[in-house]
UniProtKB/Swiss-Prot annotation:
GO terms for biological process: translation. This protein is located at the 30S-50S ribosomal subunit interface and may play a role in the structure and function of the aminoacyl-tRNA binding site. The keyword Ribosomal protein applies. Belongs to the bacterial ribosomal protein bL19 family. GO terms for molecular function: structural constituent of ribosome. InterPro entries: Ribosomal_bL19, Ribosomal_bL19_CS, Ribosomal_bL19_sf, Translation_prot_SH3-like_sf. This is Large ribosomal subunit protein bL19. GO terms for cellular component: cytosolic large ribosomal subunit. The keyword Ribonucleoprotein applies. PANTHER family: LARGE RIBOSOMAL SUBUNIT PROTEIN BL19M (PTHR15680:SF9), RIBOSOMAL PROTEIN L19 (PTHR15680). The gene is rplS. Keywords: Ribonucleoprotein, Ribosomal protein.
């Protein structure tokens, strides 16, 4: 087995198949498993996907939300076991792959049109 085929086989076994398809502009609820000392709990992070990057095991996505008037962005590895589940709340209609322009918009200007 060549190195490339070996890497491909290991990568394929690590990919998650239970996640829904989503794109930048979609509103997600990401359920993240958090371990604090000996306790474990689920924390929900809800916001708009502003980017997806990479491929295979190293693929990541960034979710942005406004919390107490402050913009919070969190980047998650897509295939990590720390993600319990992902719910797609809304499908957004955007014409860009990276929605960095949302960082400078406030209030109603930062809304994204929904796909029906």
């Amino acid at each position: 087995m060549t190195n490339h085929k070996l890497i491909e086989a290991v990568t394929k076994s690590q990919l998650r198949t239970d996640l829904p398809s989503f794109r930048p502009g979609d509103t997600l609820r990401v359920h993240v498993r958090i371990i604090e000392g000996t306790r474990e709990r689920i924390q929900v992070f809800e916001g708009i996907v502003i980017k997806r990057r990479g491929g295979g095991v190293s693929e990541t996505f960034t979710v942005r939300k406004i919390s107490s008037g402050v913009g919070v962005e969190r980047t998650f590895p897509l295939h990590t076991p720390k993600i319990e589940k992902i719910e797609v709340k809304r499908r957004g209609k955007v014409r860009r792959a990276k929605l960095y322009y949302l960082r400078s918009l406030r209030g109603k200007a930062a809304r994204i049109q929904e796909i029906r």
